[in-house]
Amino acid sequence: MTKRRLAAGIGAFILLIVTAQGAGANTPDKPKPNGRVLIISLPEITWSDLTQRDAPTIRGILDQGAVGGLTTRTITRVTALTEGYLTVGAGTKAIGKGLKPILLTSKGAGLEVGEKFGTGTAADAYEQRTGQSARQPIVYLGIAAAIAAQQEETYDAKIGALGDALKRAGYNSAAIGNADRTTSKSSAPEYERSLVTALMDSHGQLGGGEVGSELIEVNAKAPFGLQINIDTAVSAFDDAWKPRSVVLVEGSDLARVDAYRNVVSPKQTLAITREALRRTDAMVKKMMTKVDLERDTVIVLSPSPPSTTVPLGVAGMAGPGIDAGLLRSATTRRDGFVQLVDIAPTVLTQLGIKVPETMNGKPFTVTQTDMDANARRDFLIDSDQASQFRDSMITPVAIVFIIMIALLVVGAII
């Protein structure tokens, strides 16, 4: 155990006590008519990544709003990207695999209905798998398997609950992103468009956005030789960002970076992560010119952790009536910490929509604190390091405990 990690753990514990004794949590102001919510998804990004000077726009949003460490664990200890998005959409811990696993060709297959899939189109495949017609422009081909997987688990998550609630209330939902690892011309496409599952309805259909191959462009220096086309993504956002709408925008280059990390050096991993963050921030900067934080809510989240570790993710919220401070929810009951299941109830609460009983998560509240933006970020980084150290010690301590018990038993027998 290093001195720095010990100090981080002690510091985080002291800060947690201090902030818990501060001002009580408060709920943001009542939503304004025709309000909108922008969800910025940063796959596999942690608070440590955001201390770099590569994301000034995203950091600016977080600095003026309330922030927290996001627990991304769902049913399994390590949450894959699909499980993270399914959980966001359900407001309850969800899983993307089970006794009836989602096929690899479908797990991330959120497709525009006219896209080629197999010998036909995505619309054809959707109807063949569900027996329903595709009535929305985007469909999730893994919907039947996803629903079946939940029935094998304790939580019995209602897939698409957030999308259903938004639709009932007359809100438009859209997703913009494409983290595919192959081009559309590949004979064996590797789809990674699971962002669709966060806002789709319970039928696996989504009313707007863009997730097709038009969103990616070739760059030989990027992971898998692909990167998001920023101008196309911004244009798609402009079309989707209308009154009474919820739009999820994914930093898809970040997801490709994480999938690529096993074949590059640690130094190069840092370099491509920083480049992906810079490009994501540039995209968000252009989109934010259309966002009014006096009326609109922006939520920033990391839907899944890096594939190599299980750190706390990033959570942040800015908008009407949201003071700078620390996020909290009735799920965690701790200042500065929220869970992935809290995202959906928060979106609905910000829009004045009743939260369905099927959702176990609770909406964010904000606890005011004397810490400035840098101190809040440092607190979350230190808390994350302390949490990872604690997790790393569980197995060794358990082994020592078992050995000691065994020795005591042997000693008693002798």
Language-model segment annotations:
Residues 6, 22-25:
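Short, low-complexity disordered leader/linker segments with a strong preference
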Residues 24-392:
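Soluble extramembrane regions of membrane proteins in the secretory/endomembrane system
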Residues 18-23, 409-413:
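Hydrophobic membrane-targeting alpha-helices
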Residues 1-10:
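Bacterial N-terminal signal peptides that target proteins for export
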Residues 9-18:
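Bacterial N-terminal signal peptides
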Residues 381-414:
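Core alpha-helical transmembrane segments of integral membrane proteins
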